[in-house]
A protein has these predicted regions:
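Hydrophobic alpha-helical membrane-insertion signals
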Residues: 1-25
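A short glycine-rich, His/Asp/Glu-containing loop-to-beta-strand
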Residues: 16-71, 142-187
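Catalytic micro-motifs at enzyme active sites that drive phosphoryl/nucleotidyl and oxygen chemistry
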Residues: 54-56, 81-83, 104-109
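Short, conserved beta-strand element in jelly-roll/cupin
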Residues: 60-75, 120-124, 175-181, 193-207
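Short acidic-glycine-tyrosine-enriched beta hairpin
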Residues: 78-96, 185, 190-191, 196-199, ...
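Generic beta-strand structural signal
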Residues: 85, 91-93, 103, 115-117, ...
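Ligand-binding loop in jelly-roll beta-barrel domains
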Residues: 98-127
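Long amphipathic alpha-helical segments that form oligomerization/scaffold cores
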Residues: 123-150
């Protein structure tokens, strides 16, 4: 196994988007403008409905892929291709915008906690004018690797015998939701062709190696 060094540690920047949704932005700021192929990474989450109730009314995208992963709460998606979807805890929405799409993401709740992530991925130039596509992945489709000290939900890529449902994309993405017991280790052979990041949702992390970018997020 080849170790790779941690190149940067970044604290997310407080921001807002859509119709006043409060969030924490890690990529797409003055600290990290771009981490190829990642254009933006946002964490949205609050128990105060005023922080999210405005949602993300209809707006355009072009030439990127957006990946939304819900931890709790519910969002409704609707776009100009006619696709609709309702996301709940554990669900993933993967959207290829290609030549252009208009979509909205609105909370399907008026109280309670809403928490999730959205990642923007740059599309290669030769795919930027492709037909847009919306992919909804139910939490039940996710395979999970479990052992005595860790639980790994595989959204994309493969860990052990668990393989993610996200396939057929411009790169071979690897996207894990990892839960570790205290003072335990997580080891993974990352392809040399990939840039990477780790986002810490809770607790702290010690590392001896490298990940090309780590974000409180470790980039």
């Amino acid at each position: 196994m080849k170790n790779i060094e941690v190149s940067k540690i970044v604290e997310p920047v407080t921001a807002s988007d859509g119709a006043g949704v409060k969030l924490k932005r890690s990529i797409g700021t003055h600290l990290i403008d771009y981490h190829d192929p990642f254009l933006m990474l946002d964490e949205f989450g609050s128990e105060n409905k005023d922080d999210y109730i405005g949602g993300f009314p209809p707006h355009p995208h072009r030439g990127i892929e957006t990946v939304t992963y819900m931890l709790c709460g519910e969002f409704e998606h609707e776009d100009s291709t006619g696709a609709k979807g309702r996301m709940s805890a554990g669900d993933v929405q993967w959207m290829k915008t290609g030549g252009g799409i208009i979509h909205s993401e609105m909370p399907a709740m008026t109280e309670g906690k809403l928490h999730g992530f959205q990642l923007w991925i740059n599309m290669p130039a030769k795919y930027k004018m492709n037909k847009p596509e919306y992919i909804y992945i139910d939490a039940k489709e996710m395979q999970i690797h479990k052992d005595d000290d860790k639980k790994i939900k595989v959204i994309a890529g493969k860990f052990g015998e668990a393989e993610g449902p996200v396939k057929g994309h411009n790169v071979e993405p690897i996207y894990f939701d990892v839960e570790l017991e205290k003072n335990k280790e997580f080891n993974f052979d990352l392809p040399s062709t990939h840039n990477s990041l780790i986002y810490l949702i809770e607790e702290k992390l010690k590392w001896e190696s490298k990940i090309t970018i780590l974000l409180k997020i470790l980039l």
